[in-house]
Every structure is written in structure tokens, then in C-alpha cells.
Amino acid sequence: MTVFSGVNKIEFEGTFEGIGKDVVMSQMIRALQKHFPSIRDKNYEFSLFLHIFQRYVLENTSITHDLVCDKIRLPIIDEVVELDDIKNYGLLEGKLLSKLAILKLTGKANPIIGKESPLFEVKNGMSSLDVIVRQTQNLNVRYNSDVPLIFMTSLETESQVSNFLEEHYSSSKVRWKTVVQSSFPQIDKDRLLPIDLQINSHENDFWYPCGTGNLTDTLYFSGELDKLIAQGKEILFVSNVDNLGATGDLNILNFIINEKIEYLVEVVERTANVSNTGVLATYKGKLRSVYYNCLSNESASTCRIVNTNNIWIDLKKLKVLIESNSLNLPIHSSESKITHKNEEIECLQFKTQLVDCIAFFPNSRVLKVSRDRFLPLRTCKDLFLLKSTLYDLDSNGTFNLYPLKFGLLPSIDLGDEFATYETFKIGVPDIPNILELEHLTVMGNVFFGRNITLKGTVIIICDENDVITVPDGSILENVTIWHKSQLEDMNGY
């Protein structure tokens, strides 16, 4: 990519909200050079940001929530391959793993759990990082392989992740490393200029990781892509660090290699516990990711599968696309507010998503996988399920699901009082036994005791001026509770 040195490099037409587009670009370039001189030490980041900003100015690229719902088309179900159909696809050989590398997207702390999210205890004393390293280690030991593990971090997470891994897994059977993705400056929405801070401050409020789509450029410009190819790696398996079911799978790898697939995205059946996650759809003739709440009412009612962000990529094909400047991913722009020098500033952020790369790989596939490959830890209801008796976590980092009485995971609906982990652990200090639970709704000031069992459908809704405490040892089955007196009157709980 070209590092823009002046406005004469760009052709402009029309205006951008009353300001000449050439003026907007020229001002941005001068502001970056003046206020952030050290950005020139990373020419590729300078270029990446200007490339994205230029497209935003010239195209006024659609913001995600401004997509025209009626133009979104869900994929035909026949176009989706089922995991069961590819199991034992040809002869499974452990030596295929010599062609595989695994990468975990670790650029953003979980807003529900907080800055400690990668180190947060999920179950049995293990954090997300413990689980992931042990899963990869188990794969290597089982097949006598050497699958490397890469964590793509950010300015926000790099020191935390690398320090933890160095302390606990410096001598493990997994070759791990971290690669820091690019960060972009927050843009003042009104002035269309970066907030005036020195780049060396790296305050997280003013710098942000620029989305999972940046993985391609980070791998390329860091030299990691060439290193992987030189090591004989052909396929990169990418997933979110908070998806604890995303493991290297020999069946999927075998299918990809035999079919010469260049890009594969895993999807799962949508359930009641999945809210506004990504959905693969066609928009203006191109396959891309949209959020579930962008769908029309008609499409939403027929949407059966959602994106897991488990992605398999052919590394050599990726390099070809990068070097031919072919990956012009859709820009997802969003607005936020930050406080700087006691002044509230409305900001713009520009991100790209890795899943949108699917439109640029000629031989791509969508694979519907089983639910055990999508165990996200994004919300407190996810935490409620994973920490419950429904799941067992073994020493290899594998989650095992107990047989479900109703055939599906229970539907969990928690109110705003349980929105963050800090408030969640106060209201639910001990996860109830939910082996026979079908649905749970909890709203208001509700506090659970210990050794509680929930069965069937349990609804607890507390008035805003009241408090409901579920006593230790309670057994609640097919009940709706509106007032604490109902618990006091119950027999046998």
C-alpha cells in the first residue's frame, strides 16, 4: 500500500458534508504528521489508516446499522455443508497437522468481565488462556504434532497475555507467540481529525484495535505470514479467544485440504441464548457479515444459523490477495463518546471484520458445525451456563456437556442487574443446579443463595422497590415469582 504524502495522490469528486474531500484528506495527513510524528516509524499502519479513511471519505461507506434491511439475503441452506457429512472424509492422518497453525483473536478485553478477561477463571481454576493452551497441547500430544499457537493481541492486551503465557507456559509442548495488531486513532466526528494526543501515550480511550480484518495486514507486515509459509504451514485456523469450543479439528482440516478450500467459515444453529451476533448474508451481491438486528423481520424469522467467527484460511492464497491489493473489506464505522480534558467528544472508529474476507476467496465454504464448537464467553448468561453443572471441564481444556433433559441448552434471560460480572457474582455467588432447567428469567433485585436447584421454567421478576432472596437449598420447579412472600409460603424448597 502507498503511504500518502500529499493530496495530489488522490482524485476527488463532490463534497463531504460541505467540505471538499481533498481538503479533508489533506488535513488528516498533516494532522497525523504533526501530532503523531512517530507514526512514521510504522509506515504500514500509517498507510492502513489512511487507506481506510480515504475510502470512508470518498465512498461515505455505509455504517453497519444503516444497511438496507430489505437488500440483505440469507444464504440458501443447501449452500451450507454439514459437519456430519465430512466426518471421516477420506483417511484421517495426524501428519496433516504439520500443515496447520492456530491463531486466537485477543485484541479486546471482554466489556462484561473487564480488563482481566483473558485471565478470568472460567471453571476449575482455569482461565481462557489456560483452556486454549491446554487444548492445543492436547492436540500436539495426541497426534505427535507441532501445531503453533499465535495470539493476536493489541496495545490493550499484549502485556497481560504475554506475561501470563511466559510465566505459566514457557516450557509447554506448544510453541506460542504473540503478534500485536494495528491500532488506529480516535477521530473527532465533528472535525474529522484525530484527537490531539501524543502517540506515545497509547491511552486505550484514544487508540483502538482496528478490527479482526486487520489480521491479514498484521500477519503480512510483521513477516509472520511468510514465516508460517516457510515452515510448511498451509492452513490457519482463527477464532476468538472467548470461544472456548474452537479447537483444531482434524476432520475439518482434512476436508479443507482434500477439497482445496481457500476459506471456510463455521456457523451454528441459532438458539434462544444467541442475541445480536453476526450472520453471514449477501448484501448488494457480496457475501459478508451483518448483525442479526440488521435483518428485516421476515429474514430474522427465518434465520437459522449464525456466525461463530471460527475461520480457516489458505495462507498462500491470502498472501496473493494481499499483494494484489484485492482485500477491500467493508468498513464498519461506529460512533462513541470519550471525555478528554473535561470535554465530551463524539468519536468515529473504523474497523474491518475478518469474516468479510469470504467474498474475496473464489473457493470458499460455509460449514455448519455442532454446538460444542461454539462456547462463547461474552455475556453473563454465557458465564452462567459454562460455570454450571451442565458442563465439565477436564485437564486437557475440553468442555463436556451432560445429557440435556429437553434436548437443548436452557434459555437464560438475565436483567440489567446482572449485566457485568461484578454485579453478577453478587446476585449469583453459586451457580444453581440446572440439569433439568428449560428456561430461566431473572429481573430486578434478585439474590440467589447456595445449593439451589432450578427445574422446568423458572421466572423471577422483582419490583424495583423490592428485593427477592432465594434461600440456600431451594428447589424451584415451574414457578413464577413476583414477590418474596411467595418464597416464604412455599413448602419443600
Swiss-Prot record:
Reactions mediated catalytically: alpha-D-glucose 1-phosphate + UTP + H(+) = UDP-alpha-D-glucose + diphosphate
Top-level taxonomy: Eukaryota, Fungi, Dikarya, Ascomycota, Saccharomycotina
A Gene Ontology molecular function term of the record: UTP:glucose-1-phosphate uridylyltransferase activity
Family to which the UniProt record says this protein belongs: Belongs to the UDPGP type 1 family.
Annotated source species: Saccharomyces cerevisiae (strain ATCC 204508 / S288c) (Baker's yeast)
Protein name: Probable UTP--glucose-1-phosphate uridylyltransferase
Tagged with keyword Transferase: yes
Keyword Cell membrane found: no
GO BP term (any one): UDP-alpha-D-glucose metabolic process
